[in-house]
Design a protein with these regions (language model features):
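N-terminal donor/sugar-recognition subdomains of glycan-related enzymes
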Residues: 1-70, 80-83, 217-249
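Glycine-rich beta-alpha loop segments
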Residues: 83-88, 95
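Charged/polar interaction segments and conserved charged motifs
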Residues: 1-5, 91-118, 226, 233-241, ...
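A structural signal for short, well-ordered beta-strand segments and their strand-loop junctions
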Residues: 169-170, 206-211, 249
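Glycine-rich anion-binding loop/nest that anchors nucleotide
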Residues: 71-77, 96, 182-192, 204-220
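Short, surface-exposed, charge-dense and proline/glycine-enriched linear segments
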Residues: 85-87, 133-134, 199-204, 238-245
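Extended interaction regions within the primary functional domain
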Residues: 112, 130, 161-162, 181-184, ...
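Acidic/Gly/His-enriched mid-domain segments of enzyme catalytic cores or analogous surface patches
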Residues: 49, 56, 64-67, 90-91, ...
Length: 249
């Protein structure tokens, strides 16, 4: 499956989600453009946030992804899954609040996990756990959608005021081509993580999925309405199923 096929699958589900929840595409567009403008306006004082450096961050992440086994971490992850992946030399990309699992470990193991963490995929609602990633300068894959403007604005302000802000890659969920942003496909932070890894060239069957469940709201989910979240998780599972069905056997 090519990177563009991965994105196509993920984007089709985005369209279905908007229809299911009656969310206007224009709201997604407005949020994306506002995030882009906000980050661009701060790039004069944060050189790593310029459009050129954000492109370099994509290239750097892609190179690291292709340099060994990779695990995508979802909100229902448990400690045993993390330890097993760590022992088999996986690197990690965490989906939003799932990064909170790291605090469950003793300090030496915690440090090993942080050293293997490549990025955090977030729509900025995974507090308080995502703050730890910023403090560790973990690359943020920051997403804009129609109802998270306040969340991403708060996060951008918080990390822009840090002495050493993390590097950023910006994502959106519109069908438009937006210079300085990506739409790798996917809807929740969890399936967007998988789509991103696949879009950057890792074959879908080679991605280890930790903590991906659609029957429960995971322990590490951000602030959310449980009933609504379960409806969203159905679409996450659809993305995963379609990616696996389309992957070469």
């Amino acid at each position: 499956m090519s990177p563009h096929e991965v994105r196509s699958i993920g984007m089709k589900v985005q369209d279905r989600v908007r229809a299911q929840f009656s969310w206007p595409l224009e709201s997604d567009r407005e949020s994306a453009m506002m995030l882009l403008q906000s980050v661009n306006s701060l790039s004069s004082k944060i050189p790593d946030w310029t459009e050129e450096e954000r492109e370099n961050s994509i290239t750097s992440l892609q190179e690291r992804l292709l340099n060994g086994p990779i695990a995508a971490v979802g909100a229902a992850v448990n400690s045993d899954e993390i330890l097993s992946a760590l022992n088999s030399d996986h690197r990690f990309i965490f989906a939003d609040g799932s990064i909170g699992i790291i605090q469950e470990f003793e300090n030496d193991i915690r440090e090993k996990i942080w050293s293997k963490t490549l990025a955090l995929v977030t729509d900025a609602d995974g507090h308080p756990y995502i703050s730890q990633a910023a403090e560790r300068k973990i690359m943020h894959i920051l997403h804009a959608h129609g109802d998270n403007e306040e969340d991403w604005a708060k996060l951008v302000k918080e990390i822009s005021e840090m002495k050493a802000p993390p590097r950023l890659i910006l994502t959106h969920q519109t069908p438009d081509r937006i210079e300085g942003m990506l739409n790798p496909g996917g809807f929740t932070d969890g399936d967007r993580t998988i789509c991103l890894i696949g879009f950057l060239g890792v074959p879908i069957p080679q991605i280890s999925l930790l903590g991906y469940r659609s029957d429960i709201v995971g322990q590490w989910s951000g602030a959310t309405d449980p009933e609504r979240k379960l409806r969203k998780l159905i679409f996450m599972q659809e993305v995963i199923d379609r990616l696996l069905e389309g992957a070469p056997k």
